[in-house]
Amino acid sequence: MDSEIVERLTKLGFVKTSHTHIAGEPLVIHAVAGAGKTTLLRSLLELPGVEVFTGGEHDPPNLSGKYIRCAAPPVAGAYNILDEYPAYPNWRSQPWNVLIADNLQYKEPTARAHYTCNRTHRLGQLTVDALRRVGFDITFAGTQTEDYGFQEGHLYTSQFYGQVISLDTQAHKIAVRHGLAPLSALETRGLEFDETTVITTKTSLEEVKDRHMVYVALTRHRRTCHLYTAHFAPSA
């Protein structure tokens, strides 16, 4: 089964790292948002004997009984895959065959990866540029030269759209005073929205203490993300 997974990883553009996979240990896979992780998991679910669990958002049950389940102990005799493994407390102590995650979403230490993919097909070039400015290794894999899905503005003068995501307590309170229902970045981990507005009272993303929360907040949108800081100057 490992060889089948490696073949599929290679076709999706995943790259083998220098960390050697030892037989009997979990195969560890890390991928950025939009790299095709969910597509991979759903294709693996079609294989006999494979069970997929997740520490993130799981699927609703279906008639076939084959779906991405809420994280639980591995099934005896099955080939067990754990998605978003850092969110599941027992990932180290249980016998998983594959551990997979977008590890950039987590502050906690994660396992060393055997395969990685830093190429996103979902996020646009400007979103990628914003993430790279704060130190994330992510690459735009699309073909569209302009990113109409990402806009920057000023926190105190701009209109909020879609799901508001706050990066600090003060920004959260500002959104509430406007009669909105903001979510903290942590609350949105594993979720997606058509449109988001990410807000912070800091003058730049570099000032946000929890850098992994910046990554989470800027990768929740399917179509459009508005980023509002306390100091906005259009990029040259």
Swiss-Prot record:
GO terms for molecular function: ATP binding; RNA binding. It comes from the Viruses. Keywords: Host cytoplasm, Host-virus interaction, Inhibition of host innate immune response by virus, RNA-binding, Suppressor of RNA silencing, Transport, Viral immunoevasion, Viral movement protein. Its main location: host cell. The keyword Hydrolase does not apply. The keyword Isomerase does not apply. It is found in: Host cytoplasm. Residues 118-236 form the (+)RNA virus helicase C-terminal domain. Residues 1-117 form the (+)RNA virus helicase ATP-binding domain. GO terms for biological process: symbiont-mediated suppression of host innate immune response; transport of virus in host, cell to cell. GO terms for cellular component: host cell cytoplasm. InterPro entries: (+)RNA_virus_helicase_core_dom (IPR027351), P-loop_NTPase (IPR027417). TGBp1, TGBp2 and TGBp3 seem to act together for cell-to-cell propagation. TGBp1 is the main movement protein that physically cross the plasmodesma with the viral genome. TGBp2 and TGBp3 would facilitate TGBp1 function. Belongs to the Tymovirales TGBp1 protein family. Homodimer and homooligomer. Interacts with capsid protein. Interacts with host AGO1; this interaction targets the host protein for degradation, thereby suppressing the antiviral RNA silencing. Transports viral genome to neighboring plant cells directly through plasmosdesmata, without any budding. The movement protein allows efficient cell to cell propagation, by bypassing the host cell wall barrier. Increases plasmodesma size exclusion limit. Acts as a suppressor of RNA-mediated gene silencing, also known as post-transcriptional gene silencing (PTGS), a mechanism of plant viral defense that limits the accumulation of viral RNAs. This is Movement and silencing protein TGBp1.
